Amino acid sequence: MNRKDKYYIRAKRENYRSRASYKIIEINNKYNIVSRGDNVLEFGSSPGGWTQVIENITQSVIIAVDINRMDPVKNTVFIKMNIFDDDIFKSIDHAMAENNIKNFDSILSDAMSRTSGIEDRDHYNSYKICERVMDISIPRLKNGGNIILKQFQGDMTNEFIKKWSGYFNYYKITKPKASRQHSREIYIIFLNRI
């Protein structure tokens, strides 16, 4: 973590857990993904920077999933689990039932595996995470719902978009200002589930 990074400094000053908070703030301000009262499923939630922002907007139930622990956030049910674990479906469905959630208004993923520095490998790993998130999400997303996913851009990005965009009215690709400029990370936004 670069302690001279302006987003890091700002996050500390504004009591956000990570600089990533400003990514979701910018994306949501531009695309209105999450609104008050929405039920949200979030992948890759730890340490909770996105979760804090989302809870402040929705003031409703968030189900957050991460392989790493996360300190509590108001109105958030946290599931500490690897999304590739076979029990992930059951765990999410149980949390939904416990909180009277039939389906989600928005699903967000900032999930990423540890980077290796090998671009093709990092892209492939992020692609597989996005595929898994979509497999979990599509049956649990309401009509009209939205999904955001982080992916390292690469040669499978277009294939991924082509595969999943048919479930939605349209999609966008964005790179928030808070993303490091040298990073290949992009955010794929699928809007208005059909």
UniProtKB/Swiss-Prot annotation:
Keyword rRNA processing assigned: yes
Keywords assigned: Cytoplasm, Methyltransferase, rRNA processing, S-adenosyl-L-methionine, Transferase
Enzyme active site: K150 (proton acceptor)
InterPro entries (UniProt xref): RNA_methyltr_RlmE (IPR050082), RNA_MeTrfase_FtsJ_dom (IPR002877), rRNA-MeTfrase_E (IPR015507), SAM-dependent_MTases_sf (IPR029063)
Gene Ontology MF annotations: rRNA (uridine-2'-O-)-methyltransferase activity
The keyword Cytoplasm is assigned to this record: yes
Catalytic activity, EC: 2.1.1.166
A GO CC annotation given for this chain: cytoplasm
Gene3D superfamilies the UniProt entry points to: Vaccinia Virus protein VP39
Catalysis: reaction(s): uridine(2552) in 23S rRNA + S-adenosyl-L-methionine = 2'-O-methyluridine(2552) in 23S rRNA + S-adenosyl-L-homocysteine + H(+)
Enzyme class of the recorded protein, top EC level: transferase
Compartments it resides in: Cytoplasm
Pfam families registered for this protein in UniProt: FtsJ
Residue sites binding S-adenosyl-L-methionine per the record: G48, W50, D66, N82, D110
PANTHER family, sorted: RIBOSOMAL RNA METHYLTRANSFERASE (PTHR10920), RRNA METHYLTRANSFERASE 2, MITOCHONDRIAL (PTHR10920:SF18)
HAMAP family: RNA_methyltr_E
Protein function: Specifically methylates the uridine in position 2552 of 23S rRNA at the 2'-O position of the ribose in the fully assembled 50S ribosomal subunit.
Family membership noted in the UniProt record: Belongs to the class I-like SAM-binding methyltransferase superfamily. RNA methyltransferase RlmE family.
This protein's name: Ribosomal RNA large subunit methyltransferase E
Gene designation per UniProt: rlmE
